[in-house]
């Protein structure tokens, strides 16, 4: 019974809640203390990812005196700051490198059936945006906030061959592999 309860609470911490078609993921909750004259003041921070599973994703960072309020604030903030990402049938268009601070990420498209091979904060972002097959590696700092920012930066900088061809005024066939 106790094992079942601990398993449920462990699953609930990273559970995706789907309402209005959005995937919500809790990446990290942190307790922060501030020392004042009367002792310590504790506050909580929450880092969350919100996505629609079809190329739209946002992240939020909320702070409050209680955990549920911090999570709610971060979810609202994430919904306000959504950005669109161009995907290629559930994977990336091309390999991507990005960094934020000391956190670097490398993401590579993968064939169908591979799944999301990524760790921690990167996995949450990739699943929320709707990537089904990808190989990803975090290099350097494993700070969740910087990893999320680096992953989003890499996804936002990725461009489809159609977009690149349009920008250069060329035909998409000019970019085919092997020529």
UniProtKB/Swiss-Prot annotation:
GO terms for molecular function: rRNA binding; structural constituent of ribosome. The keyword Ribosomal protein applies. It holds the Pfam family Ribosomal_S5. Part of the 30S ribosomal subunit. Contacts proteins S4 and S8. PANTHER family: MITOCHONDRIAL RIBOSOMAL PROTEIN S5. With S4 and S12 plays an important role in translational accuracy. Located at the back of the 30S subunit body where it stabilizes the conformation of the head with respect to the body. This is Small ribosomal subunit protein uS5. It comes from Xylella fastidiosa (strain Temecula1 / ATCC 700964). The lineage of its organism: Bacteria, Pseudomonadati, Pseudomonadota, Gammaproteobacteria, Lysobacterales.
């Amino acid at each position: 019974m106790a094992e079942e309860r601990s398993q449920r609470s462990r699953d609930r911490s990273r559970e995706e809640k789907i309402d209005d078609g959005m995937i919500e993921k809790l990446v990290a909750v942190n307790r922060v203390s501030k020392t004042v004259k009367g002792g310590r003041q504790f506050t909580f921070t929450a880092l969350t990812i919100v996505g629609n599973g079809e190329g739209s994703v946002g992240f939020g960072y909320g702070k409050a005196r209680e955990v549920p309020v911090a999570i709610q604030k971060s979810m609202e903030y994430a919904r306000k700051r959504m950005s669109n990402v161009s995907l290629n049938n559930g994977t990336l268009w091309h390999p991507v490198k990005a960094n934020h601070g000391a956190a670097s990420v490398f993401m590579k498209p993968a064939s169908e059936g591979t799944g999301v091979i990524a760790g921690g904060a990167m996995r949450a972002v990739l699943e929320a945006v709707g990537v089904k097959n990808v190989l990803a590696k975090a290099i350097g700092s494993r700070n969740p906030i910087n990893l999320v920012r680096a992953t989003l930066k890499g996804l936002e900088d990725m461009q489809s061959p159609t977009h690149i061809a349009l920008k250069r005024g060329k035909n998409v066939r000019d970019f085919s592999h092997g020529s």
